[in-house]
Curated annotation (Swiss-Prot):
Protein name: 6,7-dimethyl-8-ribityllumazine synthase
The protein's role, per its UniProt record: Catalyzes the formation of 6,7-dimethyl-8-ribityllumazine by condensation of 5-amino-6-(D-ribitylamino)uracil with 3,4-dihydroxy-2-butanone 4-phosphate. This is the penultimate step in the biosynthesis of riboflavin.
Keyword set, alphabetical order: Riboflavin biosynthesis, Transferase
BP GO terms, sorted: riboflavin biosynthetic process
Protein source organism: Prochlorococcus marinus (strain NATL1A)
Residues annotated as catalytic: H93
Binding site residues for 5-amino-6-(D-ribitylamino)uracil: F23, S61, F62, E63, A85, V86, I87, F118
Signal sequence range: none
Annotated EC: 2.5.1.78
Residues that bind (2S)-2-hydroxy-3-oxobutyl phosphate: D90, T91, R132
Length: 158
């Protein structure tokens, strides 16, 4: 029996795109910082002049799938990370945005064969979102680790 796993080693050559929602940017900027910190610590050049990473801003989480699709189709990236923050309000808008964003991102990943990390926080309150994007527990770091592992795993199976 073969065991196939992704690793975090030899990830310094990985080409990554991050698609990030501007809505709730107090949160998404923190997620981006955590993400970039993790990638940098694993050898990926995250400087402004880097040819390893690109960051695309979209208005909100609902728009993440379409830009992810276009970036994945370029063939330039080995993995994408989507970042967003959807906080429950008094209307059903939350449910619609979360449902469509998650389904859309999953569909794009399956159809293009490019792993896309779903880094969209879905919380009931702003406080919950801040806790998940904070200094002690920044999920942006975790999303970047998932991207490194999936990039490595895809290389191992293809």
């Amino acid at each position: 029996m073969a065991t196939i796993e992704g690793t975090f080693e030899k990830s310094s050559s990985l080409k990554v795109a991050i698609v990030i929602a501007r809505f709730n940017d107090l949160i998404t900027n923190k997620l981006l910082s955590g993400c970039l910190d993790c990638l940098s610590r694993h050898g990926i050049d995250v400087s402004e002049s880097s040819n390893q990473i690109d960051v695309a801003w979209v208005p909100g989480s609902f728009e993440l799938p379409i830009i992810s699709q276009e970036l994945a189709r370029t063939g330039k990236y080995e993995v994408l990370i989507t970042l967003g923050a959807v906080i429950r309000g008094d209307t059903p808008h939350f449910d619609v945005v979360v449902s469509e964003a998650s389904k859309g991102i999953a569909t794009v990943s399956r159809e293009t064969g490019v792993p896309i990390i779903f880094g969209v926080l879905t919380t009931d309150t702003m406080q919950q979102a801040l806790e998940r994007a904070g200094i002690k527990n920044n999920l942006g770091w975790s999303y970047a680790l998932q991207a490194l592992e999936m990039g490595s795993l895809m290389k191992a199976v293809t």
